[in-house]
Amino acid sequence: MILLALPNKGRISKPVNEILEKAGLKISVHGRSLFAQTVDPEIKVMFARAKDIPEFVRDGVADVGVTGYDLMLERDTEEELEMLLDFKFGNARLVIAAPENSTVNSIEDVKDGMKIATEFPGLTKRYLEKKGLNLEIIELSGATEIAPFIGVSDLICDLTSTGTTLQLNRLKEVENVVSSTTRLVANKKSMDDPEKSAKINQVLSGIKSVLYAQSKRLIMMNAPKDKVSEITSIIPGMGGPTVSEILSNDKMLAINAVIDENKVFETVTNLERLGARDILVVPIERIL
């Protein structure tokens, strides 16, 4: 049996749960319970704060978990966890920012003794030390953007996705500390256990199959027999398109193929030009 730690709230919680459900790992949640069972009796779920998950997995409380790369660095657990997968979403950057009217425009303008407010004291301290800077770090638990305007700090170190929040709060970016995405991580001892690692790899495989399918589409059509060669040349598919007879029409063939989502518009245009008809483009839930 393995225990999977998932964020109990926040912007990555919903998409992660949706991916697991598409992978076939439906979670049975009862009220506000901190634990839940999945359709697989050998996989149990624990809901926790995303910031605590790196330590829970490192310490073996959970065998595998989903968290942000920034949170792994904050808890200084990066080297102690087995990195299994980058979900490629939940993108954010941890940046140092200053008020728009500040004389600090780059990291070179930051001076020893300045105050910096952050929800990431560990990561901020290590980064500043690497830059040879000694600042007073003020740990806050939210609303970091207000700190410079109420005399709490000179600078902030906070997460941003688009930079819009910084601009709305009259702040300017001074330095990019680290870029972060959502990660799947595992306990190293659990990965050394044959039974647990096998189950963890099942979870990993399921997630990968969903993520891979997100960028693909199944395209189906009926096409003239004399155009099949041209049509199959523009939809190579995965291992080649599937071509089959249409019982009610001996002049047409049915063709199915998997194509990249970003090529759908161009492909459909070319297929219509070649005489394909009854074209269907369908999302795919999983590709294994």
Swiss-Prot record:
Subcellular location, principal: cytoplasm
Free-text activity regulation comment from the record: Feedback inhibited by histidine.
Catalysis performed (reactions): 1-(5-phospho-beta-D-ribosyl)-ATP + diphosphate = 5-phospho-alpha-D-ribose 1-diphosphate + ATP
Recorded GO MF terms: ATP binding; ATP phosphoribosyltransferase activity; magnesium ion binding
Domain of life: Archaea
Keywords from the UniProt entry: Amino-acid biosynthesis, ATP-binding, Cytoplasm, Glycosyltransferase, Histidine biosynthesis, Magnesium, Metal-binding, Nucleotide-binding, Transferase
Obligatory cofactor(s): Mg(2+)
Record's keyword annotation contains Transmembrane helix: no
GO cellular component terms, semicolon-separated: cytoplasm
E.C. no: 2.4.2.17
Pathway entry: Amino-acid biosynthesis; L-histidine biosynthesis; L-histidine from 5-phospho-alpha-D-ribose 1-diphosphate: step 1/9
Localization: Cytoplasm
Signal peptide: none
Pfam families xrefs: HisG, HisG_C
GO biological process terms held by the UniProt record: L-histidine biosynthetic process
Class of this enzyme: transferase
Job description of the protein: Catalyzes the condensation of ATP and 5-phosphoribose 1-diphosphate to form N'-(5'-phosphoribosyl)-ATP (PR-ATP). Has a crucial role in the pathway because the rate of histidine biosynthesis seems to be controlled primarily by regulation of HisG enzymatic activity.
Family statement drawn from the similarity comment of this UniProt entry: Belongs to the ATP phosphoribosyltransferase family. Long subfamily.
Name listed for the protein in its UniProt record: ATP phosphoribosyltransferase
The species this protein was found in: Methanococcus maripaludis (strain C5 / ATCC BAA-1333)
